[in-house]
Amino acid sequence: MRLSRYFLPVLKETPSDAEIVSHQLMLRAGMIKQEAAGIYAWLPLGHRVLRKIEQIVREEQDRAGAVELLMPTIQSADLWRESGRYDDYGDEMLRITDRHDRDMLFGPTNEEMITDIFRSYCKSYKDVPKLLYHIQWKFRDERRPRFGVMRGREFLMKDAYSFDVDEAAARRSYNRMFVAYLNTFARLGLKAVPMQADTGPIGGDLSHEFIVLAETGESEVFCHADLVEMGAPGLDVDFDGDLQPLVDQRTALYAATEEMHQPEEFAAVPADRQLSARGIEVGHIFNFGTKYSEPMKATVQHQDGQPRPVHMGSYGVGVSRLLGAIIEAHHDEKGCIWPESVAPFGAGIINMRVGDEACDAACETAYQGLVKAGLDPLYDDTDSRAGAKFATADLIGLPYQLVVGPRGLKEGKIELKVRRTGETHEMSPEDAVSRLAEGAFSDV
């Protein structure tokens, strides 16, 4: 992509109403534009990152054996009355009436609808287990939206739901999502700690939140410090095997959100390993048994011929919130430092003297080489000042920046800057392209 053709409305000043770093940088880098309280338009740069995050979430759901579908955003109130949650959910639910005076709602979550879908088609124990997910925009009318996409009213969510014949099978589905989430967040460059959590209005008796530690986190969390450095299970996990040991390894040490915190248990953690910090919730999983299947009569016939309610679980990831969490974890005073897996562009080319025949030719050659290598470069072919070009490249987080100027080209060299470390290397344009293509400076 050539910057002269791209839509990148960067801001020179930080908006005064942006309280946290991720909100500030997303506005300054031209990633989002606020349209109403807690509601944002996703501009091209932000949309590119969002789609990359979404794709990683999708790939890890697929790897774990989940099957994607898509449910509508507008739901019938009748389903929520059937489960008993229509009157209980509160003012966060946006309730609407259609032209026929039928009560509808903009879905804040999908337990009722997915249960209705399941019960319409699955009648036998042979029809389970099932693990279904979708990625869709949600709306919750937050009383006080703040922190940009971290606590907005409209947000992109991945919701997965499991259906199993009994509690033991439901726990196996829970473990699948537990492990899938660890791998997902690791691929996004995040160290997410699973913590015992309150089930809230979703219900159930087993729940974990996945927390990324950050000073701007919405709540206080408590954990054994070893959990922060514990690596992800890895992409070669056998999801059809016994995952309980992997889950046990990551739940044996103390970790709890503020609501579930037990001070006496935390005191038993060695003093030098006690960690109390602020945290950002990026995922939440629940095992809620027959809370929805029983009132909604989602049953399957067992081998003894008797119908029984299926055991269910719910597994959510805030896809749009993840973008903010990644920035909170990866930034400096100059701007975003994206993990390569979600960087909006694979590299940047900065032409220091547009119109100079040698510079233009070298940039064009490098651009075509990076495109051929699949690195999706952003070529700054504008006539902006050099300082402004460097500032923009750092602000939006171009992971590798090829700086092409007439002085270096006289010696057949350009400068390659690694955004993550600040290191610079001088080499020929051809070497720069080939080394980037082979991942010589990769953070993976």
From Swiss-Prot:
Principal subcellular localisation of the protein: cytoplasm
This enzyme's EC code(s): 6.1.1.15
EC class name: ligase
Substrates-to-products reaction catalysed: tRNA(Pro) + L-proline + ATP = L-prolyl-tRNA(Pro) + AMP + diphosphate
One GO CC term on file: cytosol
SUPFAM superfamilies per record: Class II aaRS ABD-related, Class II aaRS and biotin synthetases
Record GO biological process: prolyl-tRNA aminoacylation
One Pfam family named in its UniProt record: tRNA-synt_2b
Localization: Cytoplasm
Molecular function terms, GO-annotated: ATP binding; proline-tRNA ligase activity
The entry's keywords: Aminoacyl-tRNA synthetase, ATP-binding, Cytoplasm, Ligase, Nucleotide-binding, Protein biosynthesis
Purpose of the protein: Catalyzes the attachment of proline to tRNA(Pro) in a two-step reaction: proline is first activated by ATP to form Pro-AMP and then transferred to the acceptor end of tRNA(Pro).
Family, per entry: Belongs to the class-II aminoacyl-tRNA synthetase family. ProS type 2 subfamily.
Subunit architecture: Homodimer.
Matching HAMAP family: Pro_tRNA_synth_type2
Protein name: Proline--tRNA ligase
